[in-house]
């Protein structure tokens, strides 16, 4: 009975002690992040760095509408295909939109020379002025300028390009022509023209009365002489003949001279260009809506300040960098491991060793105390604020460094440049892989550092308490300390703010420590006596049992006993 009382007394003394635990915040967040060493680490807070949403719409870019080519493409718009008349008034735009299967390009069959380079030039143009470079009525007095073709029909009638003139003989002659234009627009001027290649000598004579015709075009930066290639060809768009289309950019103050004895498709209108670095050309089936954005992709517009996106590599405006990642999330909080909180006889709660506290909501790190006046949480505001400031600055720095927003347009290649296009794709893929790898590695490293940083802060807080309490309390192995003295709320606050008075509680702690140690020693002595008694009693019972069995077996003849003297 005495032993039982001593054990209960010891249990009461041990459990009734005042305690203080060091812990960290936990919540019901479902956020997870990856680190260098772990995947899907549950955390209390994190920020997403990867935009994966768009609205599926074409929008105005910073309030400026795009130029929608509709059923026309760049060729049809610039040459002036009669089916593209609605585009003639176009003056300015934020970007240009083509559809994947635009029908109306060059209505008369032929090749547009260096077309891909022209598209590249137009991708940086945000406005133009269409003007009459060679007035129709006065520029070609000795030639007929009303050439039309069924291939460029409009409303059921033969027609021709709105920006070019098909010059043919006047009467029976095609006298040599010479005409020039001086660029006085103060900006680059896009000049377009063509050369007709008949299918036979008879057609050549019929149109130009000159079997040895040529076309010459010259400026400071351009100088070419063309001769018609007369040959039989398969019929395309009801035509055996072909027209090749050419262009050049005329610098301010420069002069362009046209000279021909036949076959010239002369410029009628030209374009003075104004460049804008955020412009571009996209190919998209998305429809236009009344909306505004600062970043447009062929899939839809993006309104995001995040540094990365995985929606589309082609972007126009202030856009996040495209990467192939599916997840880029940076941790800003702590590991989220809510402890299994239970209330025992005295309402005990564990410290950081057994997980975080959902009950502490006003800080990242802090304390839980328990004494005669009750229990409660208190955040350590200083360490929490320092951590928040450090992590916020780090996240902002990462976003600022990686958030170089820009336009990324596709490069143009013609059908004869497939090897170059394939090589370019491989190079672009290589750069994209590097960007993706760098972005993912950066996030993984920073996540690892942040979580280690939090672990260190909790450990420092624990060491701070330990260095104050010394032997006035004992570590009980779960992030908590058990006082050897009574510690009221004022005492607890002094531990938290670093002003704990160790000498004040030393004597009481010493007495209680000795008392607990004495109870432990006495209970150990009682346990030893009980153990010896139990062993002896068990042995006697065993011997008596063996004797009884032997006597029974001897009496019924199952066992014979012989005693030899």
Swiss-Prot record:
It is a single-pass type I membrane protein. Coiled coil: none annotated. One of its GO terms (molecular function) is host cell surface receptor binding. Glycans are attached at residues 27-28, 73, 142, 285, 497. Keywords: Clathrin- and caveolin-independent endocytosis of virus by host, Clathrin-mediated endocytosis of virus by host, Disulfide bond, Fusion of virus membrane with host endosomal membrane, Fusion of virus membrane with host membrane, Glycoprotein, Hemagglutinin, Host cell membrane, Host membrane, Host-virus interaction, Lipoprotein, Membrane, Palmitate, Signal, Transmembrane, Transmembrane helix, Viral attachment to host cell, Viral envelope protein, Viral penetration into host cytoplasm, Virion, Virus endocytosis by host, Virus entry into host cell. A lipid is attached at residues 554, 561, 564 (S-palmitoyl cysteine). One of its GO terms (cellular component) is host cell plasma membrane. Binds to sialic acid-containing receptors on the cell surface, bringing about the attachment of the virus particle to the cell. This attachment induces virion internalization of about two third of the virus particles through clathrin-dependent endocytosis and about one third through a clathrin- and caveolin-independent pathway. Plays a major role in the determination of host range restriction and virulence. Class I viral fusion protein. Homotrimer of disulfide-linked HA1-HA2. Interacts with human CACNA1C. This is Hemagglutinin. It comes from Influenza A virus (strain A/Wilson-Smith/1933 H1N1). The gene is HA.
